[in-house]
Design a protein with these regions (language model features):
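DNA replication initiation on ssDNA origins
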Residues: 2-108
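DNA replication initiation modules
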Residues: 26-35, 98-120, 155-198
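Short Gly/charged-rich anion-binding patches and loops
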Residues: 47, 125, 178
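Hydrophobic, Leu/Ile/Phe/Ala-enriched alpha-helical segments that form helix-helix packing faces
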Residues: 68-71, 75, 130-134, 179-187
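Short connector loops at helix/strand junctions that flank enzyme active sites
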Residues: 105-107, 134, 145
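Short amphipathic alpha-helix segments
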Residues: 119-134
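Short acidic amphipathic segments
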Residues: 136-139
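Short, conserved phosphate-binding/catalytic loop or strand-edge motifs used
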Residues: 142-157
Length: 198
């Protein structure tokens, strides 16, 4: 009963009720090994989700999943790991004239991670469980094939998101803690707790 009341309160006050916007832009950042530079790009959420469903010609994700068991317990890492971008769902970043990264928009997406799964079957189970809650924006398998990511969409009571980076960081930390409390009871695997950051 307490869980249902909490979910009802969150859904009505902090989570976009049926206002999922796929126009929001998600940031992808890739660190280039040779130059040491950071390549930043953005994609609309629906385009990114389509892209995650299909692998590129290079097949870096399939190769990573195949080689990962051989790398366990060693200091070695996948040689093309730099080809896989880090995805920042919470914010749309842009560059200043000086080349510094700055927040352009805060999306209100909180990412929960469930790591150390045995494989794709457990990741698929996590995705099905996450789909039970209406505030789940997306859920997908991680690049290793042994993790799952859940994106939960939060907003202020008026349906907007914070505009200043400092306000967004505080809101995001609070939203992350609430998301963990809501989703953990649905999952037989522990959510990997992280320091919430944009």
């Amino acid at each position: 009963l307490v869980f249902r009341l909490l979910m009802s309160y969150l859904y009505e006050n902090y989570i976009y009720p049926n206002k999922l916007t796929n126009r929001m832009k998600i940031t992808l950042i890739r660190a280039e090994k040779e130059s040491g530079k950071e390549a930043l790009s953005t994609l609309e959420a629906d385009a990114l989700i389509k892209k995650l469903k299909t692998e590129t010609k290079a097949g870096h994700v399939s190769t990573l999943r195949a080689i990962l068991p051989q790398l366990e317990g060693t200091c070695a890492q996948y040689e093309h790991i730099d080809k896989l971008p880090r995805i920042y769902p919470a914010v749309e970043y842009s560059r200043t004239q000086e080349g510094e990264r700055r927040m352009k928009n805060y999306n209100g997406l909180v990412q929960l991670e469930i790591n150390r799964l045995s494989g794709i079957a457990e990741a698929e189970y996590v995705k099905r469980q996450a789909a039970l809650l209406p505030q789940t924006f997306a859920a997908f398998c991680g690049s290793s094939g042994r993790s799952a990511k859940i994106w939960v969409l939060f907003a202020l009571p008026d349906g907007t998101t914070p505009k200043l980076e400092s306000d967004a960081a505080l809101f995001h930390a609070h939203a992350y803690r609430m998301a963990v409390k809501c989703y953990q009871p649905l999952l037989p695997f522990a959510i990997t707790l992280k320091e919430p950051s944009l």
